[in-house]
């Protein structure tokens, strides 16, 4: 007990799954024409979407602002709920594998996401929808307010060394450049090859 804090701070963690699909679907409703398709009982079972709409993960403020608004609105709703033992409510956008399970149990969306297919993990753009590259998706995720997701926000990317360049020096320089573009607001921390890092 000697290592316990004198005053215990409790948190209650909640999470968002499918953020990119919700953002893209709301963008489709706002910028395109979306028609619900109903079954014989009147239940909406699919959508027909006509026209173009911006998508989250491409550094397009129209879609990225929708995603940020969703995260903020959900967190505001959570904050309004009294928490057990005065816990501090928190939220995450960082599914690990649950995005697959949730997607398999969910219907179609106005964005074109098909029934029964996995959601993108965490704050990633919808699978196959990001067309402007890794840096654009990093910039989109960077528009989410961390104060609304204190449990964490994840963006999963995969790069092979060969995809970064031919020589080790080129690979290091390109990787640092990608990270700088996504995380450094100016060039004050830009890569300097003379420093050996």
Predicted regions: what is each one?
Residues 1-197:
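Acidic, glycine-enriched catalytic cores built around paired aspartates
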């Amino acid at each position: 007990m000697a290592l316990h804090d004198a005053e215990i701070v409790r948190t209650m963690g909640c999470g968002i799954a499918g953020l990119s699909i919700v953002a893209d679907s709301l963008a489709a409703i706002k910028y395109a024409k979306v028609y619900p398709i109903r079954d014989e009982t009147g239940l909406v079972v699919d959508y027909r979407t006509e026209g173009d709409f911006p998508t989250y993960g491409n550094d397009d403020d129209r879609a990225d602002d929708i995603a940020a608004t969703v995260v903020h609105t959900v967190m505001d709703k959570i904050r309004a709920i009294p928490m057990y033992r005065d816990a501090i409510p928190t939220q995450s956008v960082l599914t690990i594998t649950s995005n697959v399970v949730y997607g398999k149990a969910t219907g179609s969306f106005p964005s074109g996401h098909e029934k029964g297919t996995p959601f993108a993990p965490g704050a990633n753009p919808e699978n196959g929808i990001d067309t402007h590259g890794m840096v654009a998706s990093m910039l989109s995720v960077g528009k989410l307010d961390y104060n609304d997701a204190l449990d964490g926000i994840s963006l999963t990317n995969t790069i092979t060394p060969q995809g970064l360049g031919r020589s080790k020096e080129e690979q290091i320089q390109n990787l640092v450049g990608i990270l700088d573009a996504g995380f450094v607001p100016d060039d004050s921390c830009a890569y300097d090859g003379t420093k050996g890092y």
